[in-house]
Amino acid sequence: MPADLVDVLIIGGGPAGLTAALTLARQLHTAILFDNQSYRNGNSSFMHMIPTWDHKDPAQFREKARQEIFSNYSTIRLENATIAKAEKKDDALFKITDENGSSWEGRKLILATGSQDIFPPIPGYADAWGKRIFHCLFCKGYEDRSAKRAGILAIQSAANVPMAMHQAENAAQLAEQVTIYTNGQEALESQLAAILADKGSKTVFKVDNRVITGVSLNGDDLSNKASVQVQLADGSQVEEAFLVHNPDTQVKSTLATQLGLDLAPSFVPGTGDIAAAAPFYQTSIRGVFAAGDCMTPYKVVAGAISSGCNAAVAASAQLLAEKHGHQPLF
């Protein structure tokens, strides 16, 4: 038996991984939390919808969580490492290896690796992401309430009527006028225009089919006067308080593929999430669990915390049943 064998290997140090570690500690399980310091909200100054941590810095949230875990619980360890390889050794053990060749073994594996956003090829998009381009108007946008204008980028997987209208309706809660940018997609423009005309909604919503050639920030994320400039192919520019776009995503890291895990169906080839059903979030391989952004299209901190807890409770249930030779709960 390897000297560095632990009960659970947790890959990912965001809210899901941190919650999984804390949950396992409460039942005296040994676990290692692997963190490569790469986070989806790393470009954001604030996080929301977390009681006691609403409109506060996500980096400080992670630091405070680490302090609580590693100050109070001796069975959890932290490794600042990027895991490059994961494999199932046998029915009882998993082995992971980092990019420097160091390896660890565990009885259970929790993947909380997060997801990778696939940005559209619009100049300036990456710089504005998380600052003036919002993927979720529950997470961002409230601070811009009563804005004169906001825009929807109806591109990528949002280039359809249901998603474009859903995002526009959310934006209309916060802005007086909402423009849906269809970026040269004439069929989508016509469909949206017909719906808006039929509903008599032209005073709030409008459609702009001009091709977007770039976006740029005005001000910074900490200023209530910040905005985003939309550059269009005809040379004109439009200033919006914020843009809404939920980019396509793919599972971050290749570990799920290496393990042969099933992925949830996706409309866009090469994108999607790890298939892991509630409430236990076990994947297609027994003993491997997924938590956080890597296993759901609803990528918010509150959801990551919830799934991290559930995955850890499920891993614990299997570990304890195996320890005592009992029939497992699942």
Regions found by a protein language model. Give the residues of each.
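FAD-site-proximal beta/loop scaffold in flavoenzymes
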Residues: 127-144, 246-300, 310, 317
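A Rossmann-like FAD-binding core segment of flavoenzymes
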Residues: 63-91, 95-98, 175-273, 320-330
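FAD-binding core/adjacent interface of flavoenzyme oxidoreductases
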Residues: 3-6, 76-148, 269-271, 275-279
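Conserved FAD-binding catalytic core of PHBH/FMO-like flavoproteins
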Residues: 128-174, 179
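Eukaryotic N-terminal targeting leaders
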Residues: 1-5, 329-330
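Beta1-alpha1 glycine-rich phosphate/pyrophosphate-binding loop at the start
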Residues: 6-63, 158-186
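A conserved FAD-binding loop/helix module that cradles the flavin
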Residues: 21-22, 165-169, 291-330
